[in-house]
């Protein structure tokens, strides 16, 4: 039996990864992290979607110690989310160590349940400049974690080279465009669906959706070229 663990926030990217995993694996688990994020509504969104999609198990882990250590606009309500980069060249929504911790804990969970893969929705095509979303980081951590566990757990990043429009096309390919559009929560201000429309996450999500809706065939063709999915299904 093929098993996978999806790092699941209840947002657009991780929900798209989850619906894809359900088509590829016999048993799918999801793990969600409570790190004291300002958009805490995403945890309840993840719970609701996990139940709705009928996965094998959904684990919510308390990792609020990350919020104590990592000062960010996502862990401090008094720090406004900004479009401007900081002096270090990173957005103020970067949470240092977040994906290091999340992927490591997800791998431990995968070890426990006998899963062969950990799936994460990180991407470096359309992304906010976070260093822990880069392909080279994920591959390096994957090697280290597999060595440390003495088990070949595979980190999968199905969205790594997709832009946001192509990610929308992928959700549509699996018949969940409306689910992702209406029920997921990507907004840094905790508003589901189309969100606040003003934060960087909403801007990226909205631009990708409009590009997809304006040229479904063209975007689906790009998705097909990159993944082998999309074009033939007519999404």
From Swiss-Prot:
Q: Which CDD domains match?
A: QueC-like
Q: Which annotated residues bind ATP?
A: 8-18
**What's an example Gene Ontology biological process for this entry?**
queuosine biosynthetic process
**Sequence positions that bind Zn(2+):** 187, 196, 199, 202
Q: Which family does it belong to?
A: Belongs to the QueC family.
Q: Which Pfam families match?
A: QueC (PF06508)
Q: Which organism is it from?
A: Aeromonas hydrophila subsp. hydrophila (strain ATCC 7966 / DSM 30187 / BCRC 13018 / CCUG 14551 / JCM 1027 / KCTC 2358 / NCIMB 9240 / NCTC 8049)
- The protein here is known as 7-cyano-7-deazaguanine synthase
- Known function: Catalyzes the ATP-dependent conversion of 7-carboxy-7-deazaguanine (CDG) to 7-cyano-7-deazaguanine (preQ(0)).
Q: Which gene encodes it?
A: queC
Q: In which pathway does it act?
A: Purine metabolism; 7-cyano-7-deazaguanine biosynthesis
Q: Which GO terms describe its molecular function?
A: ATP binding; ligase activity, forming carbon-nitrogen bonds; zinc ion binding
Give the keywords, sorted.
ATP-binding, Ligase, Metal-binding, Nucleotide-binding, Queuosine biosynthesis, Zinc
InterPro entries noted in UniProt: QueC, Rossmann-like_a/b/a_fold
Q: Which cofactor does it need?
A: Zn(2+)
Asked whether the keyword Nucleotide-binding is assigned, the reply is yes
Record's catalysed reaction(s): 7-carboxy-7-deazaguanine + NH4(+) + ATP = 7-cyano-7-deazaguanine + ADP + phosphate + H2O + H(+)
Q: What is its EC number?
A: 6.3.4.20
**What does the Swiss-Prot or TrEMBL cofactor note state?**
Binds 1 zinc ion per subunit.
Sorted alphabetically, which Gene3D superfamilies does this protein's record hold? HUPs
């Amino acid at each position: 039996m093929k098993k996978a663990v999806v790092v699941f926030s209840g947002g657009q990217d991780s929900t798209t990864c989850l619906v894809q995993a359900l088509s590829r694996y016999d048993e799918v688990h999801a793990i969600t992290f409570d790190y004291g994020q300002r958009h805490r509504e995403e945890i309840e969104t993840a719970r609701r979607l996990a139940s709705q999609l009928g996965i094998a198990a959904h684990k919510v882990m308390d990792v609020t110690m990350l919020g104590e250590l990592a000062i960010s606009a996502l862990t401090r309500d008094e720090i406004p989310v900004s479009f401007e980069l900081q002096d270090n060249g990173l957005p103020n929504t970067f949470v240092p160590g977040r994906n290091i911790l999340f992927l490591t804990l997800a791998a431990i969970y995968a070890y426990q349940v006998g899963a062969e893969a950990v799936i994460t929705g990180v991407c470096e095509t359309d992304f906010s400049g976070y260093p822990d979303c880069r392909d080279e980081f994920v591959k390096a951590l994957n090697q280290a974690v597999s060595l440390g566990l003495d088990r070949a757990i595979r980190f999968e990043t199905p969205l790594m080279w997709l832009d946001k429009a192509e990610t929308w096309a992928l959700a549509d390919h699996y018949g969940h465009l409306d689910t992702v559009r209406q029920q997921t929560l990507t907004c840094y201000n905790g508003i589901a669906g189309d969100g606040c429309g003003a934060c960087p996450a909403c801007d990226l999500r909205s631009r990708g959706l409009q590009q997809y809706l304006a040229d479904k065939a063209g975007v689906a063709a790009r998705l097909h070229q990159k993944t082998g999915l999309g074009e033939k299904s007519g999404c």
